[in-house]
């Protein structure tokens, strides 16, 4: 497949030691060579790097001192010729280099276009392409491992095997229908067809069983920290994040907005939301923060309720317990370094079967126990090995759910005595749905939509 030559800045914009301009396409080497003062890039070997300067042809002025990497097709990310110009990381210099390359008839790449070309040129499938973005956005080592496994094609191979099984079953059905007189072909009975379809259904179910943990590793657990003002919510956030992000004072109501931060808890990414203290208040700004806190609490996957060990429970405390019924929550009884005034029996009663953790955040006590409780709640204390294949992408989960339904429809039809040839419709639809995961049976509009979500230069 032939495309025009494209270029984009592949590194994050801003001041830094190095910036990279990536160029891909049939004419990439020749067009960069026009503005490169050094070796003749068209004559150098593949996968080599060369020192030189980028020159403005209009003024013959040296613009940048660079190192240029040459990678020749097909052994490149896009399976096209690729040039990467390594220059200094200032905004002006890297943009000037890009503009000089574009002036040679190169087009500015669209977001995700390099990865899109890798897909369209057959180097990776669609699920592997999506994993590239997951790797970039990974918040923990575990999330990174999930993305790498998908990039290496582990999910693709699982899906490929299932599609092959369905295809072989369809071929077997077809032969039985078209050539019933062949004695050397096994008869496709209802029993055999149910066995084959059930096996596919079970394999789809196994993959889907990893989706809850996979989605958590990919997207994180939305975790709201709630409680009355000055019970230690911001201190808890800072203890988990291990930096002073929130304002911690003795003045009630100092957290007037919602503060968010990602934190790695035993390999699980938590999207922590420190909310304004929930209480009745006349302060308009604080009221807005309180309302947003209630909204965040309703949307959270996990709620951490913080109460004060050194004060009796209030009606506001008890109202929080009632508000989180039906959600996953953990109770943190903070400030155990102060004299006890809270009734722990009442806390346990309000918490029902949920975990209650005592902490003294000022003395850094109880945080490890809290982290273990979170891991226990969502991963039963352990996370599978790095070699485990998870399905974490919402698009993949949706397609697998559809495939489970259509293969289930096929099994139900067989059990109800529907003619075997009629069952082909559901089997074929299952095969097509699974193909959408890897991009084998996907519409061009969806491809464009998926890659438009990528960052520029990737």
From Swiss-Prot:
This is tRNA modification GTPase MnmE. One of its GO terms (biological process) is tRNA methylation. Its cofactor is K(+). GO terms for molecular function: GTP binding; GTPase activity; metal ion binding. Binds 1 potassium ion per subunit. The lineage of its organism: Bacteria, Bacillati, Bacillota, Bacilli, Bacillales. Disulfide bonds: none annotated. The gene is mnmE. Homodimer. Heterotetramer of two MnmE and two MnmG subunits. Residues 220-379 form the TrmE-type G domain. NCBIfam families: mnmE_trmE_thdF, PRK05291.1-3, small_GTP. Mg(2+) binds at residues 234, 255. CDD domains: trmE, TrmE_N. It comes from the Bacteria. GTP binds at residues 230-235, 249-255, 274-277.
